[in-house]
Amino acid sequence: MATVDRWLLPDGIEEVLPPEAARIEIARRQVLDLFQSWGYELVVTPHIEYLESLLTGAGQDLDQRTFKVVDPQSGRLMGFRADFTPQVARIDAHTLRREGPSRLCYAGSVLHAQPRALSTSRSPIQLGAELYGDASPTSDVEVISLMLATLQLTDVPDVHMDLGHVGIYRGLARAANLSGDVEQQLFDALQRKAVDEVQTLTADLPKDLGNMLRALVELCGGREVLAEARVRLGRAPASVLAALDDLLAIADRLASRYPDLPLYFDLGELRGYHYHTGVVFAVFVPGEGQSIAQGGRYDDIGADFGRARPATGFSTDLKTLVTLGRAEVVLPAGGIWMPDSSDAALWQHVCQLRNEGQRVVQALPGQPLSAALEADCDRQLIQQDGRWQVLPLTH
């Protein structure tokens, strides 16, 4: 390897330098404090574990995004976490085993073998919150509200939200008795809004079902979409109508809480179709091609761990929030330069200053006073009249 190559990082892997690292860490603490104020408890999960545990309940997308290695001790395949949710689901289902609802949150680095999109990070700092044990739209509204509070805390401007419900397509596909291949092809066509393909794939279905599946391409827009859906999907199975009712209840509550939040509905949006079971949502901002925060309902994700529970949650990338947010993160200003001395009184004074939250930097042997500027110090400790005092730094 050439010397120059030793400085290179893999595509999508980045290091964070001061002061940006301090901004990210301060924001992380603030967001976790926000989660705690809503009743969410922090969990810390392993960076790496056996692959079958890591991917349990997850879809194919997560499998493709997971780095895999062989454990030299057991010979078993392991993976680096690419998403916290399967791990948190295991904690809820297998470890905590609470009877009532559980509110859990997390913050930490994840690693992606494949990026979410072109030029996106493969090592985001994922943070999120999850609510287990309640199947009502009230829980969905809670996690969406917490997501919006997180964006408000970091002052991300001009957000708008997309809402959908995978239960609508799933209920129609079941009623049509589609084969697995056709269901997947139709799913792909709906995501691309490929009208001609959708028409071809539904041509042989009963008239009502074909019309309703084709309608999903067009059922996107503002709140009026929900009223239109009640008409165009009026002959749908009961599960589809129940999904529409849930979506309407969530939309009503959000409109009441956030009257200025633009809401966009897309009933053909099937983000996380193989993973989510109900409402899905995502937040976008101008200039960003990908959602900056997303989530939805994923009931029974803990079934493979022996306990099926309703679940809903959201996640986002802390690095992205800090980059896009306008919130002023106040970094500790300046510092105090401590001379290289063995004086016990000086040490006691420095300990007191640090306990008070002051930043004190120790001078190393041979360092001139000018080094204090490089250490971002604006004051110094000087002994006067037999006492150590903090005075302005003299150049």
Curated annotation (Swiss-Prot):
The keyword Thylakoid does not apply. Heteromultimer composed of HisG and HisZ subunits. Its main location: cytoplasm. The keyword Cytoplasm applies. InterPro entries: aa-tRNA-synth_II/BPL/LPL, HisRS-like_core, HisRS/HisZ, HisZ. GO terms for biological process: L-histidine biosynthetic process. Belongs to the class-II aminoacyl-tRNA synthetase family. HisZ subfamily. This is ATP phosphoribosyltransferase regulatory subunit. It comes from Pseudomonas entomophila (strain L48). One of its GO terms (cellular component) is cytoplasm. Required for the first step of histidine biosynthesis. May allow the feedback regulation of ATP phosphoribosyltransferase activity by histidine. Pathway: Amino-acid biosynthesis; L-histidine biosynthesis; L-histidine from 5-phospho-alpha-D-ribose 1-diphosphate: step 1/9. This function is generally fulfilled by the C-terminal part of HisG, which is missing in some bacteria such as this one. It is found in: Cytoplasm. SUPFAM superfamilies: Class II aaRS and biotin synthetases (SSF55681). Keywords: Amino-acid biosynthesis, Cytoplasm, Histidine biosynthesis.
